[in-house]
Amino acid sequence: MNRMVSHRSVWIFFALTLLLSWAIWIPTQLLVPENKQLPLQLLGGFGPFLAAIIVIGVKEGKSALRQWLRQTFHLRLNLIWYLAAGIFLPFGIALLHHLLYLLAGGKSAFTFDQTWGIYLAELVSTALVGGGNEEPGWRGFATPRLVAKFHPIVASCIVGIFWVIWHIPLYFGSWVGKDQPLLWFFIYASGLSIILTWLYFRSSQSVMPVMLLHAGTNIVFDFFPRTNVIFSSADLDFNVFKAIAYWIVALIIMVATKGKLGCRDAYPDSTSDSYGGA
């Protein structure tokens, strides 16, 4: 891969992602009643994936696009990666979040009143249309191209920043903004971006486990309480603890991988220059 072309393509990807998704989301927030917005909000969520397809198809050709699709969606992974992504990591992070809540003086109100069948059905549907479908763009396209230029942690944070910016129109609708302060979303999304980058490289650059983890983190917190123990707002408490939990896990990964987030396995011939000298 030509590094200069790759580096330029990723900025085109970010711009196109915003254009495609916002072209749906902004008119939706302005013109569509709240109770009818969800289908269009979900449709806009395919912006990163579609932008990646367009950029690769136009700048690298159909052959490169087919190769990228095969690599991005390959399934031949050890079962442990699917279990870790869909169950162990989401529930581990959520339980850490709950522990922090208890240490701060909250009362345990953890419930899991759904069957595992319902959880798994929600996990798959959310991976396909409710958040996980973003990952072919964010992690499958943008992350490896940024890592060709920047340190893996820097690359993860760049993706995290655009990830948050991309969500901004949803803060004016019924889906995100009412229970998720933008500042704390930025903080925990940056930590989650590092975790997702690590999982992407450790799973041989397949986005399938990454889609499951993204989906799992979207739904698992539905089983945990929102009671204020520090701030006046239960939602603020919830998101503060959520951000801390994500960053604890992200820091553990950063220390364990010496900041490489597993990408040295994917680019064994890379040098420090590949990361912009970091």
Sequence positions of predicted segments:
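Membrane-helix interface linkers and caps
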Residues: 2-4, 24, 28-85, 99-115, ...
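Membrane-interface starts of transmembrane alpha-helices
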Residues: 8-9, 36-47, 150-159, 206, ...
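Alpha-helical transmembrane segments
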Residues: 10-22, 45-49, 82-93, 158-160, ...
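Aromatic-anchored segments of alpha-helical transmembrane domains
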Residues: 18-26, 90-95, 161-170, 215-224
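C-terminal membrane module of polytopic membrane proteins
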Residues: 57, 205-208, 213-278
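Juxtamembrane helix-entry segments on the extracytoplasmic side of multipass membrane proteins
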Residues: 109-124, 174-187
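Membrane-interface helix/loop boundary segments of multi-pass membrane proteins
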Residues: 133-160, 174, 201-206
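Hydrophobic alpha-helical segments embedded in the membrane of multi-pass proteins
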Residues: 186-195
